[in-house]
Curated annotation (Swiss-Prot):
Natural source organism: Aliivibrio fischeri (Vibrio fischeri)
GO molecular function, one term: acyl-CoA dehydrogenase activity
EC number: 1.2.1.50
Stated name of the protein: Long-chain acyl-protein thioester reductase
Catalysed reactions, as listed in the record: a long-chain fatty aldehyde + NADP(+) + CoA = a long-chain fatty acyl-CoA + NADPH + H(+)
Keywords carried by this UniProt record: Luminescence, NADP, Oxidoreductase
Recorded name of the encoding gene: luxC
Matching SUPFAM superfamilies: ALDH-like (SSF53720)
Lineage: Bacteria, Pseudomonadati, Pseudomonadota, Gammaproteobacteria, Vibrionales
Source species, domain of life: Bacteria
Function: LuxC is the fatty acid reductase enzyme responsible for synthesis of the aldehyde substrate for the luminescent reaction catalyzed by luciferase.
Pathway named in the protein's UniProt entry: Lipid metabolism; fatty acid reduction for biolumincescence
Family: Belongs to the LuxC family.
Keyword Secreted: no
UniProt xrefs under InterPro entries: Ald_DH/histidinol_DH, Ald_DH_C, Ald_DH_N, CoA_reduct_LuxC
Enzyme class: oxidoreductase
Amino acid sequence: MNKCIPMIINGMIQDFDNYAYKEVKLNNDNRVKLSVITESSVSKTLNIKDRINLNLNQIVNFLYTVGQRWKSEEYNRRRTYIRELKTYLGYSDEMARLEANWIAMLLCSKSALYDIVNYDLGSIHVLDEWLPRGDCYVKAQPKGVSVHLLAGNVPLSGVTSILRAILTKNECIIKTSSSDPFTANALVSSFIDVNADHPITKSMSVMYWPHDEDMTLSQRIMNHADVVIAWGGDEAIKWAVKYSPPHVDILKFGPKKSLSIIEAPKDIEAAAMGVAHDICFYDQQACFSTQDVYYIGDNLPLFLNELEKQLDRYAKILPKGSNSFDEKAAFTLTEKESLFAGYEVRKGDKQAWLIVVSPTNSFGNQPLSRSVYVHQVSDIKEIIPFVNKNRTQTVSIYPWEASLKYRDKLARSGVERIVESGMNNIFRVGGAHDSLSPLQYLVRFVSHERPFNYTTKDVAVEIEQTRYLEEDKFLVFVP
């Protein structure tokens, strides 16, 4: 099955150019034809004149209106998106519907949208008006043009990236991934459905270019960026750094790994349920997905038995996506290598999941796709060497009380997020993302400083600098 995906420029869906596209093979030999940038499309994109001259309330209300469309299971755009995820990306029906549900949740959570701005920027008003702060007035201005280099493994990361830029009133040039050319296109198309003439809609462009071909046109787009948001693996991040202008900030959301810690659980079922969720969500394609479980205490066999049950449960309520021949082969190879090494191996029907019980210092291949290594340890000290700065994103812990004991040690070792088991995909409002408060990198804080006759806490006289120099009285005013 072939599908043509046009680009969107300044909120307008472009006619598909039969002379400028790249054909990409996706799941089960299904193919898509992706429009690629041309001299004409780049010129149109860079001639954008519209700015998001709206207050935060208007922005949030527009996003909420779009979200209400996504909330309806009868919305045609939502139904098409679910079908595309299943047909072309190999998602199970449950996984695809959950993805659409999460898009609705992100757009409709008005309180969370306000709180994201409040906690990252310090106030929900700083984008709209000058606020008194110390001896100044301060206002946050959008950087301008935000270029989003999206990854294909976690569709919601692209949605999050775009929403952050919209909340901070930045225009968006969105470069989709060939492994998920659908999500950004569907989101921006839903903006068009609601109001094609809305300033937010008209500030959106969605396009594609290959990384391994002539960079002349893509370099023009990158040169136009005021801020770059890069998602993906090492090569994607290196590309972003290489082709971004030297003066712009690059928000790098690169490859990370995550793990779970289970300490002497009284409720074995709850512990195993949380770990199973953290393994199964996105089939371990996300940075926050658990790949290793460290079990502190006794009764490991009981935990493993329950983890089997919970993984079987998730195989029913959230079936994994389809795997290619190579992915299935990697899964089988990991199983055989682990058995040859003498490790305990448990597996689900039809490669639904894989558990390998191994020592902490022995790591085999990681085929992902719901495969996990379980290591029994006696103390947190045995786990700390595997928590690495800039590489370990999320540590999920059960019971929650154990996280209070270990969070300082984990933080010093470099972890970026600590959550309760079963919560790795929920990024709580107010938290950091990969050690950053991302919205701060999407704005310029402008300060309007008070005049000379404004007295400060430490200097209760007018700041007459010329007079102080003439009379050599500077030290008189030093507190």
